[in-house]
Amino acid sequence: MTASQRTLMVMAGGTGGHVFPGLAVAHRMEAAGWRVVWLGNPAGMEATLVPKHGIPMEYVRFGGLRGKGLKTKLTLPVNLLRACWQSLGALRRVRPDVVLGMGGYITFPAGVMTALSGRPLVLHEQNSIAGLTNKVLAKLAKRVLVAFPGALPHAEWTGNPIRAELAHTEPPHARYASRSGPLNVLVVGGSLGAAALNEVVPRALALLAPGERPRVVHQAGVKHIEALKANYEAAGFAAGEDVRLVPFIDDMAAAYAAADLVICRSGAMTVSEIAAVGVAALFVPFPYAVDDHQTTNAAFLAEAGAAVLVQQRDLSAELLADWLRGQSRASLADMAERSRALAKPEATDEVARVCAKAAGANLETLQ
């Protein structure tokens, strides 16, 4: 670190929905010459993932209360005080010019201590319904940013920071116009899989006449790939050229760009990535998400005719097959164009610029 080098502290943890957008901003700031240090929980996924990106870490031990027992709730005051003390120690060691909170329970004690120590705090909320931590910290932050309009009052709509390769794909009209033949459908269950999609999609395809069937790439999640193969075999399909089953997809930008339609859950980052690429989507929100935020995430696009939203309780093989029969590449291309129009592909740069400005830095360094 040079005497003139500025420092960003990113605080985020718990899930990929918090960590991955934080990493996108971290790399953007590093590219502009900033030093970045990450504040996370030693028990969280960030403790393994972030160091692989070459970013040094500070640790705070603090967890949530949802679904926890009486003992955890009774010890909350002690644990919170300890986490605040650990956060203050990290702030004193790192001496950041600005702190960016991307969500997760550890951001609460660290955010409070950031504000009390007089350092500028910038918050970013990834979901359409703000979590409790960000609702409280928003009152202490210098700038509040949201991925979906209206998630927090008086916030700036920047979109979700995403990987650069997702933000710079070919426009939908060019991609769709270059294709012919059966529709290309990508089914994404996420890293953990989505049992409802893994069960319904094969049965829906079996209800379609051979000439109506799309080409399918179905990502199942590592733990679910064998069960998915069994589901397709039971529906009369053998994995081959028109049905490709995979446990994981390394290059999501290429997978999205090759698809005419994506069938998936509606986590915040998934919705943001699909909009950035510009691809038609049928969202089936995870019904047990906190505050049902996946439904409102999907509704942001669905209400604009940029996607279709089907609740899991309503999803059936018959419904999906009937809907697929009514789609054409042209209708899906129209949906993709509407989706792209609602995207914020420059969100990573915008969040980085806000952080720089909060620190009193020259924005030209982020051009």
From Swiss-Prot:
Source taxon at top rank: Bacteria
GO cellular component, one term: plasma membrane
Keywords carried by this UniProt record: Cell cycle, Cell division, Cell inner membrane, Cell membrane, Cell shape, Cell wall biogenesis/degradation, Glycosyltransferase, Membrane, Peptidoglycan synthesis, Transferase
Entry's localization field: Cell inner membrane
Catalytic activity: di-trans,octa-cis-undecaprenyl diphospho-N-acetyl-alpha-D-muramoyl-L-alanyl-D-glutamyl-meso-2,6-diaminopimeloyl-D-alanyl-D-alanine + UDP-N-acetyl-alpha-D-glucosamine = di-trans,octa-cis-undecaprenyl diphospho-[N-acetyl-alpha-D-glucosaminyl-(1->4)]-N-acetyl-alpha-D-muramoyl-L-alanyl-D-glutamyl-meso-2,6-diaminopimeloyl-D-alanyl-D-alanine + UDP + H(+)
Any one GO BP annotation for this protein: lipid glycosylation
EC number(s) per entry: 2.4.1.227
Family annotation (Gene3D superfamilies): Glycogen Phosphorylase B
Pathway annotation: Cell wall biogenesis; peptidoglycan biosynthesis
Membrane disposition: Peripheral membrane protein
Major subcellular site: membrane
A GO MF label: undecaprenyldiphospho-muramoylpentapeptide beta-N-acetylglucosaminyltransferase activity
Binding site for UDP-N-acetyl-alpha-D-glucosamine: T15, G16, G17, N127, R163, S191, I249, Q294
Function: Cell wall formation. Catalyzes the transfer of a GlcNAc subunit on undecaprenyl-pyrophosphoryl-MurNAc-pentapeptide (lipid intermediate I) to form undecaprenyl-pyrophosphoryl-MurNAc-(pentapeptide)GlcNAc (lipid intermediate II).
PANTHER family the UniProt entry points to: GLYCOSYLTRANSFERASE, UDP-N-ACETYLGLUCOSAMINE--N-ACETYLMURAMYL-(PENTAPEPTIDE) PYROPHOSPHORYL-UNDECAPRENOL N-ACETYLGLUCOSAMINE TRANSFERASE 1
Annotated family: Belongs to the glycosyltransferase 28 family. MurG subfamily.
Annotated protein name in UniProt: UDP-N-acetylglucosamine--N-acetylmuramyl-(pentapeptide) pyrophosphoryl-undecaprenol N-acetylglucosamine transferase
Taxonomic source organism: Burkholderia cenocepacia (strain HI2424)
